[in-house]
Each structure stands twice: as C-alpha cells, then as structure tokens.
Regions:
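Nucleotide-activated chemistry modules centered on ATP-dependent adenylation/adenylyltransferase
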Residues: 2-301
Length: 301
C-alpha cells in the first residue's frame, strides 16, 4: 500500500496510525534507547557480509575460527548468509579440552545442523607453554600454540575471527584485515591504514591475515542480532540462581557474573545500565596489565 496516496480514506489513515502505535508498543524499549533498530542491524550485517565475501574472493585458503561463544556463532550465521546457506571454508576449533560440557554439546549438535566442515585440533599441554606467563595467561597461551600448529598443518593464508573492538582495549587497536608475521605474531605498531572499506588483503610472504568481520559490532549488537535472527545460544549465557556467563572460555579460568537476566531481552536491558566489563569473568583479564597484549602479539585472538 502507498502510505502517501492522496485518495486514502480518513478511516484508512486512522487504522494505519493505530497499527503503527501498536508496533511501537511491541518494540522493546531497550532497542529504541540503544538505537538497535532493524536498519542498524541490517547495516552491520551488510558490512560483515561484504568483509566475508572480500576475504573469500581475495585469499586462497580460509578458515573460520569457531570458539563456540556468542560472537563466533553470529559469525557462522553471517557466513551462511554471505554464501547462500553454506559455509564454503572449514570451521576450525582449536580445542584446549577444557571447555564447558554445554559448549561441546552445542558444537556437536550445530556442526551437523549447519553442515560445517569442522576441523578440531588439540592444543599442546601446559608444560609446553612459557612458564614466565601468569597462570591464566599461560593456560590461554595453549590456544596460541595450538593455532600455530594448525596453521602449519593446513597452510591457511586467512583466518576469520570473531573479535570486537569494544570487548577489550588491545583488540580496539586491531584492523579488519590484520597481517600476521611468519610465526603468527601481531605487530601492534605496524598496521595498515583502512579507509572507506579499502582493505589490504594480501598476506605477507609465508604468513597469513586475520580477518575480523564483526570488529565494528558491540556486545549489545551481538545480542540484538541473535534475538532478531533467533540464533541458537549456549544456555550458560542466561542467568540461573543469580549468576550467568557474559563471556565463555575454558571452564577453569572463566567465572560467572552476578545477574538475573534469564532471556536475551533481559540481557539487553542489563547491558544498558551495567558498569561491569564484559570480560570481568575471565581470569586472564585480572592478571598483569600487559599479559593479554603479550598473548596477542604472540598470535592469540
């Protein structure tokens, strides 16, 4: 119907106005307050799909890192949208063997349902990791070393990762197409400029690129999109007995936060007022100030 038609009846206009008011009442207040409208989420989605397709067109051998958390599940969803229902490159899970049972159950179920070409590579034991790192950072570094082994095994020239600038200060320094050295390291002081969606998608000789399609998203964006698209989630994100997980990692170095948010709607309301950092439950983020950056420089996500 043409809403601007001159021959619409007064009665018809009244019905449209009433319908509009009804739709406004159904729109969650939190979505309006944060500006998480359909248009906003569509713009985020379109930009991310563009990045996926750009990476696929310009790199020879890609993989999507799947950590099983809310961000990487959105990444799988976006990849399926970008390529018409299927992910045309492997999903790579670098497994520490210490994830929550709910995470492994989720992985097994949705690998089948989403038709993923899943590669699971185990991390080296803690004894093989730099003993000078603080305990949680040393545990997390197993993933860095496991990723290096997977790169050497498969020869990927591009790894797609679901990091966001808003979740941690070191990640705020990242680029969408981020070059890594021959050992997988990241030089935070030497990064290519990125203007107007013009990306340098040429990996250094013998090295690879990290591609970050949701770098520009926020935690609230992730949850609003998950709600809109009805993306499956791991139940640990929802509050039980006054606690929930905002960020999921290894069970031995990840703790829940105080929360009564037992639905995505309640999570969005909580995020609108909380002063608690997203990664407050990660033991790694409470160790030495430079521990996380040391890990990222060495190749951590």
């Amino acid at each position: 119907m043409d809403l601007l038609s001159n021959d619409q009846s007064t009665e018809g206009l009244q019905r449209l106005e009433q319908s509009g008011r009804a739709r406004e009442r159904k729109t969650p207040v939190i979505d309006q307050a944060r500006g998480l409208t359909m248009d906003h989420l569509d713009e985020l989605e379109a930009q991310s799909i563009y990045i996926f397709r750009e990476a696929f067109a310009r790199l020879k051998k890609l993989a999507l890192l799947w950590s099983l958390g809310k961000d990487s599940n959105v990444m799988i969803w976006l990849a399926r949208k970008a390529f018409f229902g299927r992910v045309p490159f492997p999903a790579l899970h670098v497994d520490t063997g210490k994830k929550f049972p709910e995470m492994y159950a989720f992985r097994d179920q949705y690998t089948k349902e989403w038709g993923l070409d899943l590669k699971i590579d185990l991390c080296p034991p803690i004894e093989a990791i730099d003993p000078t790192l603080p305990p949680a950072a040393r545990s997390a570094a197993r993933k860095t070393e496991g990723l290096k082994l997977a790169l050497a095994k498969y020869g990927f020239d591009g790894l797609i990762a679901g990091i966001r600038r808003d979740e941690e200060a070191t990640r705020a320094k990242e680029r969408v197409f981020s070059p890594r050295g021959t050992e997988g390291g990241w030089d935070v002081r030497d990064q290519p400029p990125e203007f107007w969606d013009q990306f340098n998608a040429s990996p250094p000789p013998g090295a690879h690129l990290r591609i970050h399609p949701i770098l520009h998203w926020t935690e609230a964006d992730i949850w609003a999109y998950t709600k809109r698209e009805n993306i499956p989630i791991i139940p640990l994100y929802l509050a039980k007995n006054g606690k929930r997980y905002r960020s999921l990692g290894d069970a031995d170095i990840t703790n829940p936060v105080a929360s009564n948010a037992s639905s995505i709607e309640e999570i969005l309301i909580e995020l609108d007022s909380t002063k608690v950092p997203e990664r407050s439950g990660r033991a790694l983020d409470h160790e030495t100030e430079d521990a996380f950056e040391r890990l990222r420089v060495a190749g951590y996500l």
